[in-house]
């Protein structure tokens, strides 16, 4: 019998509770149809609150503290990328290629690319960007100068740097033309991801990794400067703005669902669907000021680390909804087990998530707020979910950010036994 194809679909930044499958407001009928052929997991936890370490964990089966490729006070993006380029941890792609699989990776997130070391083990790897500017020298200058394009232009003008202004203006115009033609930021490359998948899958069995970027910021008609002001304590973001952003997030999820439906239709048309292990999940979620924080990274609140997980097993496994806990870290072992004909379950007794600080430098225009960033964000945090409880610990401060039973906050004094047990669980994460 032909080995099953393996397909991993990462819906970048898609939090669990936004999806109608889990009781959320985003109508995603394509995902609902897929779920009817699949096992829907209720408690999947991302191992990290942002893209890079979460994907490394997905590909290696190791938590961030185990693979070591994560942020810290000293390690920002250049150091993190370098660590991934030097990593020798075996990846899913390497494992499957050694077993005769054609390995294909397609990403709409520039962070997941050949340049950042995520192509290891892949025969083919394609990364889509709507903007060549992001990869240009002027992009580096832009990030160093300010939080958004308007700021960059103003600062260059003030400096009287005519050459840079002209170059920036041309690149800016190119971006705007391309963005308008593709309906960006609603569409962030999902159509291209699907088109590339159809073109790049040429032989069986195959491993196909897809990263869809639609749910990730930016969102339509909103300046990131307002978010940066909020994150650095300059000016809190207003409720109306937060509500607007969340409504755009829902629209992004609903558009993504259309493209997921097209992917599934293509797999069925090519008779690839039935004999495929298809794992759909997200690398992290997205916060909308539920705990005073916007977007993702840094914190381990549910809106950031609870993610969807829907798995279709090859040649049928009865559709079901499964409790317990699941982690992206378990995907590698699940693939090994499916290929070996063993236990087809990803559920575990405990799931963890980790954060080690702030991953990126804030723009130079916020250098007067570095004290605020360091005070609030340069901290180690770790969380564990087990037995219906969650302990979310600020390690640097030596205190709990959260202690929950279900979704309800409870006191450590009234749940001493459980608090002690979860504290011991967290000791395994160094």
Q: Language-model segments: which ranges?
A:
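Catalytic domains that recognize anionic headgroups
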Residues: 1-430
């Amino acid at each position: 019998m032909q080995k099953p194809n393996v397909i991993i679909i990462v819906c970048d930044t898609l939090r669990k509770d936004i999806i109608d499958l889990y009781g959320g407001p985003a109508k995603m009928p394509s995902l609902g149809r897929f779920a009817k052929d699949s096992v829907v997991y209720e408690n999947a936890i991302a191992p990290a609150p942002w893209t890079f370490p979460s994907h490394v964990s997905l590909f290696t089966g190791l938590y961030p503290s185990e693979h070591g490729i994560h942020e810290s006070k000293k390690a920002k993006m250049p150091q993190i990328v370098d660590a991934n380029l030097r990593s020798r941890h075996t990846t899913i792609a390497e494992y499957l290629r050694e077993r005769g699989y054609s390995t294909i990776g397609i990403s709409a997130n520039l962070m997941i690319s050949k340049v950042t070391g995520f192509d290891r083990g892949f025969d083919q790897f394609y990364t889509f960007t709507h903007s060549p500017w992001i990869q240009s020298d002027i992009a580096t200058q832009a990030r160093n100068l300010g939080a958004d394009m308007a700021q960059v232009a103003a600062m260059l003008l003030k400096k009287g740097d005519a050459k840079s202004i002209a170059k920036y203006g041309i690149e800016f115009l190119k971006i705007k033309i391309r963005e308008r033609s593709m309906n960006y930021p609603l569409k962030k490359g999902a159509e291209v991801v699907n088109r590339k998948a159809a073109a790049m899958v040429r032989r069986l069995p195959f491993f196909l990794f897809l990263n869809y970027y639609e749910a990730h910021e930016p969102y339509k008609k909103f300046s990131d400067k307002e978010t940066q002001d909020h994150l650095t304590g300059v000016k809190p973001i207003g409720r109306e703005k937060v509500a607007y952003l969340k409504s755009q997030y829902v629209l992004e999820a609903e558009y993504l669902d259309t493209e997921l439906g097209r992917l599934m239709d293509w797999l069925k048309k090519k008779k690839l669907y039935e004999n495929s292990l298809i794992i759909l999940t997200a690398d992290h979620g997205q916060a909308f000021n539920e705990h005073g924080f916007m977007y993702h990274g840094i914190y381990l609140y549910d809106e950031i680390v609870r993610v969807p997980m829907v798995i279709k097993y090859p040649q049928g496994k009865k559709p079901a909804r499964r409790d317990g806990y699941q982690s992206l870290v378990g995907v590698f072992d699940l693939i090994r087990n499916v290929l070996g004909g063993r236990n087809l379950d990803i559920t575990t007794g405990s799931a963890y998530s980790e954060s080690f600080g702030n991953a990126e430098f804030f723009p130079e225009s916020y250098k007067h707020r570095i004290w605020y960033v360091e005070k609030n964000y340069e901290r180690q945090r770790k969380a564990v979910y087990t037995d219906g409880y969650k302990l979310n610990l600020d390690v640097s401060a030596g205190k709990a950010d959260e202690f929950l039973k279900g979704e309800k906050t409870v006191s450590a004094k009234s749940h001493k036994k459980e608090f002690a047990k979860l504290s011991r669980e967290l000791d395994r994460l160094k």
